[in-house]
Swiss-Prot record:
One BP term from GO: symbiont genome ejection through host cell envelope, contractile tail mechanism
Disruption phenotype: No tail is synthesized.
Gene designation: L
Spans through the membrane: none
Induction: Expressed in the late phase of the viral replicative cycle. Expression of late genes is activated by the viral late transcription activator C.
Main location: virion
Name the record gives this protein: Tail sheath protein
Length: 495
């Protein structure tokens, strides 16, 4: 046999002359960047062309509208995601209707305008302005508002006018119906969101949400439809316990050492402080992050899509860098009076809920993004998986470690240290792997992902398995780099 382990050149060749093969095991230096693949759950509309529970690669908002129906939850989510992140490989998996009915509520318009102006209505965060002339009645404005709604097909609702059945001929109702049925088909309706917007004197507006409670669709078929493809990040619009439990089980299996197709889910819950706090302490998921928003002008699924778009892009660039101050482009913050106070946000961060703040330009930005993991199996406080950066960094370290071994030693022989073999032989020993891991740690350290090389080197243990001589066991303890989040100082001044 040759001293060199050839891959394709046989040792029993007699035909002249030259035989040259290529080996790419040493071609790559460093670690190739992992693909930023994202999966988005969401409901399609009645005019969807895409089959339910089957992932579809989406590259534009118009493609999403054609696949899932214009104004559907999933089409709006995909458009919001792509507006914030055009680098990611976005896949969408549609669900059909949930339980309940399509009724959203009624907008009541009445009275007579005493001045010229504009009636500015916001439905699901979309602005609908109607010109108002002095003397116009609420009933006339209802017709104009419905025309504006019908002219804005990206709205998640349809509208019809219902005239007053009583004696008030200035009054009419605008009846709103959702384009999909489920717990998230309810929408926010308000007037005059921005400064300077006022309802003309004499016009009376009101909104009455539909009674009853709808339910989300079951995502079990969609989870089965995910297959074995790895999705690094998942946009999860549903926050009901059965669906979150299904997703948690799937993510934990993918996170395990056999599957290694780890992913991380992002969701948003809109509600009161009490609702959000109660929800947070009811969960304990290290692979799910939830941001809480009170008084949200837009549907929660749009915030979830944008939050995941921003976070996934930033963490793909540097998994260890904190996400604080990153803006959520296009998302409308709650009114000032609806925003959580400092003490409320601090408490929510102990309840497993991520927080946001609003900068002076009126833009929503991430304040701190955490996982929903709070306690260990004994119920004691456990911050080990608190930060999303920990999950993202661990995911990258495992990916780069696995890639280094599969790239450099794809089909090597295994021998004990001290074995004498030719330099060109495809043989690996514990000391060879240990040297490779130390070199890899230095790459991690240079990238700002880990620290304390000396301790890592001292504690690194590489040995052949005593029961399986084809197996190499490694015990290593990388010290993950931390994030600069808190600065505390005491100024002892002198007069």
């Amino acid at each position: 046999m040759s001293d060199i382990s050839f891959n394709a050149i046989p040792s029993d060749v007699r035909v002249p002359l030259t035989y040259i093969e290529f080996d790419n095991s040493n071609a790559v230096s460093g670690t190739p960047a992992p693909r930023q693949r994202v999966l988005m759950f969401g409901q399609s509309g009645s005019k969807a062309s895409a089959a339910p529970n089957v992932p579809v690669r989406i590259r534009s908002g118009s493609q999403a509208s054609a696949a899932f129906g214009q104004g559907s939850m999933l089409a709006l989510m995909a458009d919001a995601f792509l507006n914030a992140n055009r680098v990611a490989e976005l896949w969408c998996i549609p669900q059909g209707n949930g339980t309940g009915n399509a009724a959203v509520g009624e907008i009541s318009l009445s009275g007579t305008a005493g001045e010229n102006g504009s009636l500015v209505t916001y439905i699901a965060g979309q602005r609908l302005a109607v010109s108002v002339a002095a003397g116009a009645t609420g009933a006339a404005l209802a017709d104009l508002l419905v025309a504006r709604i019908k002219g804005q097909p990206d709205l998640p609702v349809t509208a019809e006018v219902r005239a007053d059945s009583g004696d008030d001929d200035t009054h009419a109702d605008v009846v709103l119906s959702a384009k999909f049925t489920g717990a998230l088909s309810a929408v926010d309706v308000r007037w005059n969101y921005y400064a300077g917007e006022t309802t003309p004197y004499g016009i009376i507006t009101a909104f009455k949400a539909a009674s009853g409670k709808n339910g989300n669709p079951d995502i079990s078929a969609s989870i089965a439809g995910m297959g074995d493809l790895q999705y690094k990040y998942i946009v999860m619009p549903y926050t009901d316990e059965p669906n979150l439990n299904l997703l948690r089980t799937e993510l934990q299996e993918r996170w395990g050492p056999v599957n290694q197709a780890d992913g991380f889910a992002v969701t948003v819950l809109s509600g009161t402080y009490g609702d959000i706090s109660t929800f947070g302490v009811s969960r304990n998921d290290h692979l799910i992050s939830c941001m809480g928003i009170a008084g949200a002008p837009e549907p929660s699924y749009l915030y979830a899509a944008t939050l995941c778009a921003v976070a996934s892009q930033a963490l793909s660039i540097d998994p260890a860098r904190p996400l604080q101050t990153l803006t959520l482009p296009g998302r409308m913050p709650p009114a000032v009076g609806d925003r959580f106070t400092w003490s409320e946000r601090n408490a929510l961060l102990f309840d497993g809920i991520s927080t946001f703040n609003v900068n002076d330009g009126g833009e929503m930005q991430i304040e701190r993004m955490i996982t929903m993991y709070r306690t260990n199996k004994y119920g004691d406080s456990d911050p080990s998986y608190l930060n999303v950066n920990t999950i993202a960094t661990l995911s990258y370290l495992r990916y780069s470690l696995r890639t280094r071994i599969t790239q450099k030693f794809p089909n090597y022989k295994l021998a004990s240290d001290g074995t004498r073999f030719a330099t060109g032989q495809a043989v690996v020993t514990p000391s060879v792997i240990k040297t490779e891991l130390l070199a890899l740690f230095e790459e991690w350290e240079n990238a700002g992902l880990v620290e304390d090389f000396d301790t890592f080197k001292e504690e690194l243990y590489v040995a052949r398995n005593k029961d399986d001589k084809d197996r190499l066991d490694v015990l290593c303890g990388p010290n993950l780099i931390n994030q600069f989040r808190i600065f505390a100082a005491q100024v002892q001044f002198i007069l």
